[in-house]
Amino acid sequence: MSLPMLQVALDNQTMDSAYETTRQIAEEVDIIEVGTILCVGEGVRAVRDLKALYPHKIVLADAKIADAGKILSRMCFEANADWVTVICCADINTAKGALDVAKEFNGDVQIELTGYWTWEQAQQWRDAGIQQVVYHRSRDAQAAGVAWGEADITAIKRLSDMGFKVTVTGGLALEDLPLFKGIPIHVFIAGRSIRDAASPVEAARQFKRSIAELWG
């Protein structure tokens, strides 16, 4: 089983704030995510600028595309994104359109599982050639005190068994990682637990060490 990658979510509102994070921890992570908040605040230039600074890193545009899949994904890929996200409630043709464009750029599409979705949809995504999903505990659910539970672990295992590369996100803390041991997680996303740490560098390194210990 290969080691899960570590992704930092830049849900900053400005590029200046995002740069404060990347200057410290870009070399400690595998993937730099231009979070939805940053995408809205700064547009696709955030993707372009971060990829220019870190060409050796995977840069994800977390656009959460809900419609106009070809147009929006092309905007992201032309800004040199490696991956883009499509929200799970989008029509299957939106996901297909985004994937078609991704292939032109040797990129990839992730389905963001935020909110309601079904296993029938999951099968449609697989049938359409989608390889990646993001299992997401929402920011608002976290704020309401919703913790990771057995239902989450069961769903993640089932998605993996279907052949998806599964990314896990949603207020992920270091102590949560052992919950997922034994599952071939593709990526773990950490946002505030790295960005807001007293030492973001050490926080990122602790995540990497824990991943190596649990999956190595």
From Swiss-Prot:
Domain of life assignment: Bacteria
Cysteine disulfide links: none
Pathway involvement of the protein, from the record: Cofactor degradation; L-ascorbate degradation; D-xylulose 5-phosphate from L-ascorbate: step 2/4
Record-linked Pfam families: OMPdecase
Cofactor note: Binds 1 Mg(2+) ion per subunit.
Lyase among keywords: yes
Stored InterPro entries: 3-keto-L-gulonate6Pdecase_UlaD, Aldolase_TIM, HPS/KGPDC, OMPdeCOase_dom, RibuloseP-bd_barrel
Cofactor(s) for this UniProt protein: Mg(2+)
Binding site for Mg(2+): 33, 62
Biological role stated in the UniProt entry: Catalyzes the decarboxylation of 3-keto-L-gulonate-6-P into L-xylulose-5-P. Is involved in the anaerobic L-ascorbate utilization.
Protein name: 3-keto-L-gulonate-6-phosphate decarboxylase UlaD
Protein source organism: Escherichia coli O17:K52:H18 (strain UMN026 / ExPEC)
Lineage: Bacteria, Pseudomonadati, Pseudomonadota, Gammaproteobacteria, Enterobacterales
